[in-house]
């Protein structure tokens, strides 16, 4: 568990040090990554300009849940044009609606839209959402009484390493939990379940690996060949002339936002794959100084970018492979969910021909589409149960 963090997008919620290192390592060892096209965007990331790292940080869903309004650059409340639930629609629907408003040019000065809470009473908002009010104030916005600019922001990766229910992988001795593991959230994680997932499966992984270690008797010696390969990979940037690593990272973030982002189609995904391939090639000619290896942040940035490029390629190719729209993955050229009975998940692996994506059928072992585990007289929701 290395902490996922889709920071390869122009707007993202995780801190910049999160760089998908765990998934990149899994790829290099030949493990399968599942559902990598499923990138969740939080609809309301703070939009404060490119000059501040505050841009992209989350403004919590409780703001919309409490009755906050989303307003475009023409001062129009627009969410009911997209969904009957308005601002309380699911994350993916609200993110796509905001993205479409941006694409149509109905934007705020920084290029996003606004969230408005003032109609709920400034004093009430300031009391109920103290942390959010302070976060906005730090960037010059008055959440309680004014308008705050927001933008969809890459928040969570539902995909990850293929694991079983006890966190084991196809590589003996490797256990994966948290955001590095795929499958726990399907195609669309519910708010709050990220922490629960890490806590539950982190505990399971600890218990299982302890039990497995006892059965092994003795630990295996490290594979010297793999260690040599990883060392050789790590020192690659010292063989090229020092260059601007950050410039390449900005190119990656722009490519992923523009072509592999909230709304996708085949042309854009192919364009994104080409841009990623170009970045891979350019990385070979951009090095870092090796004069001081201790606390060499440029070296760290180079290795982090390599991991982000590796996983970005998987996301783009998995997105191209999935020709339907499920959860957080939306294809404008394939807007329908397709047959539920024929559901599948994608499996991406790195091989001799590069990244290859295949499909694996979903096995409905407990409940099938259209069926319910509830009895005929049982309420399906807590609201129904209370009536």
PLM-predicted stretches and their roles:
Residues 64, 71-80, 85-87, 98, ...:
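Glycine- and aromatic-enriched mobile tails/lids
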Residues 16-30, 195-200:
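Gly/Ser/Thr-rich active-site loops/lids in small-molecule metabolic enzymes
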Residues 36-42, 148-149, 219-228:
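Beta-strand segments within the central parallel beta-sheet cores of soluble alpha/beta enzyme folds
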Residues 6-7, 40, 169:
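Glycine-rich nucleotide phosphate-binding loop and flanking beta-alpha elements
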Residues 6-17, 54-58, 89, 123, ...:
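Alpha-helix capping and helix-loop boundary segments enriched in small/acidic/polar residues
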Residues 2-6, 180-181:
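Glycine-/small-residue-rich beta->alpha transition segments that form the dinucleotide
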Residues 130-174:
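FAD/FMN-dependent oxidoreductases across multiple families
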Residues 25, 31-142, 146, 208-215, ...:
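An anion/pyrophosphate-binding glycine-rich loop and adjacent beta-alpha core
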């Amino acid at each position: 568990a290395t902490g996922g963090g889709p920071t390869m997008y122009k707007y993202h919620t995780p801190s910049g040090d999160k760089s998908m290192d765990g998934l990149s390592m899994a790829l290099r060892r030949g493990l399968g990554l599942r559902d990598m096209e499923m990138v969740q965007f939080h609809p309301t990331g703070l939009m404060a300009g490119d000059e501040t790292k505050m841009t992209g940080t989350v403004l919590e869903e409780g703001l919309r849940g409490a009755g906050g309004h989303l307003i475009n650059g023409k001062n129009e409340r627009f969410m009911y044009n997209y969904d009957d639930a308005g601002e309380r629609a699911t994350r993916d629907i609200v993110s796509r609606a905001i993205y479409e408003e941006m694409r149509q040019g109905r934007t705020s000065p920084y290029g996003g839209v606004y969230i408005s809470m003032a109609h709920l009473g400034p004093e009430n908002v300031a009391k109920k959402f103290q942390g959010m009010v302070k976060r906005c104030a730090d960037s010059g916005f008055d959440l309680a009484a004014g308008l705050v600019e927001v933008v969809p922001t890459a928040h969570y990766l539902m995909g990850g390493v293929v694991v079983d229910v006890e966190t084991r992988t196809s590589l003996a001795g490797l256990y994966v939990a948290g955001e590095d593991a795929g499958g726990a959230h399907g195609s669309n994680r519910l708010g709050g379940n990220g922490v629960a997932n890490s806590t539950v499966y982190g505990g399971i992984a600890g218990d299982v690996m302890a039990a497995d270690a006892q059965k092994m008797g003795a630990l295996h010696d490290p594979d010297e060949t793999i260690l040599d390969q990883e060392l050789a990979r790590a020192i690659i940037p010292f063989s090229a002339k020092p260059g601007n690593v950050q410039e390449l990272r900005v190119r990656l973030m722009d490519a992923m936002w523009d072509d592999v982002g909230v709304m996708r189609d085949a042309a854009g995904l192919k364009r994104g794959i080409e841009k990623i391939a170009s970045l891979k090639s350019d990385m070979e000619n951009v090095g870092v100084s090796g004069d001081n290896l201790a606390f060499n942040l440029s070296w760290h940035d180079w290795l982090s970018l390599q991991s982000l490029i590796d996983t970005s390629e998987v996301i783009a190719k998995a997105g191209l492979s999935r020709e339907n729209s499920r959860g957080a993955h939306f294809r404008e050229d394939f807007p329908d969910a397709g047959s539920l009975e024929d559901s599948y998940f994608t499996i991406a692996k790195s091989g001799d021909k590069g990244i290859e994506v295949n499909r694996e059928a979903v096995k409905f072992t407990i409940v099938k589409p259209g069926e319910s585990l509830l009895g005929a007289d049982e309420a399906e929701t807590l609201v129904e149960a209370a009536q």
